[in-house]
A protein has these predicted regions:
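A short glycine-rich, Lys/Arg-flanked "PGG" loop and its adjoining helix->strand segment in the class I
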Residues: 82-83, 156-175
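Class I SAM-dependent methyltransferase Rossmann-like catalytic core
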Residues: 31-58, 62
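Conserved Class I S-adenosyl-L-methionine
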Residues: 192-220
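S-adenosyl-L-methionine
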Residues: 103-129
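Glycine-rich SAM-binding Motif I of class I
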Residues: 75-79
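Conserved class I S-adenosyl-L-methionine
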Residues: 64-73
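Core SAM-dependent methyltransferase catalytic element
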Residues: 216, 231-257
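A short acidic, Gly/Pro-enriched loop at the edge of an enzyme's catalytic core
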Residues: 129-139, 143
Length: 257
């Protein structure tokens, strides 16, 4: 290769590297601005134990992205995502009937006066979420993946079929799209015990999550230790006062294959 082509190739690589660094900095600035923005007092109180900056950076969310907040509940992360992705992006605030009933009034308050103009609520059965193919860049599960195996009182079945849910999300994600899952760690759990553990303890075995995503067509793309905590008792419910808001949590990232 002659020197002219070498210089051109080197310049191209340098420019690509600069673009990557610049885009990462742009995304980080958007995340910092979202966290520092005027938000609800209760949200701010939760920042210390939720560590949203670490979670959102790990999600690699950036302005212009289209994101789904799975089982958003009252919308703590929905609001942050809305502010990060900005007017050229969008956020789907997804809940099923049970989650919507529990969070309805808080979401009304959060969305009043079109506070989050780029966010929309979507309420639908978990196994049949109506999403357009290749419409999402990112999906976020925060302390809710175990609920796919949770068995509501009086129900003969768990809340959802994990494979149906993940395959729908796989279809809805663009090529290379990312999913981040944050959840409370359970001991290694046989498949036949998953429903019991999820229902009684609200935890899940991280190995099960990896296996579920692999089966649904995702590749494991890394993990963060930002929410790991020593001293958690995996045998008690996450709502037990001895561990509440101090549970040992995994943060996994998966990429659509």
């Amino acid at each position: 290769m002659n020197s002219r082509y070498c210089r051109r190739a080197t310049s191209t690589l340098a420019f690509a590297a600069w673009l990557f660094v610049a885009s990462q900095a742009f995304a980080a600035d958007a995340i910092d601005a979202a966290i520092a923005s005027e938000r609800m007092p209760l949200d701010r109180q939760e920042d210390a134990w939720r560590k949203p900056a670490e979670v959102l950076r790990f999600l690699e969310v950036a302005p212009g992205h289209h994101v789904l907040d799975f089982y958003s509940g009252p919308g703590y992360y929905s609001e942050l995502l809305s502010r990060v992705v900005g007017p050229t992006g969008s956020v789907v605030i997804y809940n099923n009937e049970l989650y919507n009933q529990a969070a309805h009034h808080e979401l009304l308050q959060r969305l009043r006066g079109k506070r989050l103009a780029n966010a929309k609520r979507l309420n639908a059965p978990s196994n049949y979420i109506p999403l357009e193919p290749n419409s999402l860049d990112r999906v976020l599960f925060v302390q809710v993946y175990h609920d796919l195996y949770w068995q509501p009182g009086g129900s003969p079945e768990p809340l959802a079929d994990a494979q149906r849910v993940l395959r729908r999300l796989h279809s809805a994600l663009k090529p290379g799209g990312l999913v981040v899952v944050v959840d409370h760690i359970a001991k290694e759990t046989p498949r036949e015990e998953l429903i019991r553990v999820a229902t009684r303890l609200h935890r899940i075995d991280p190995h099960v999550v990896k296996a579920d995503f692999d089966e649904a067509g995702f590749e494991f793309a890394g993990e963060s230790s930002a929410l790991r905590h020593d001293g958690d008792d995996y045998s008690v419910s996450v709502f037990n006062p001895s561990v509440r808001r101090r549970t040992d949590q995994f943060i996994y990232k998966f990429r659509k294959r």
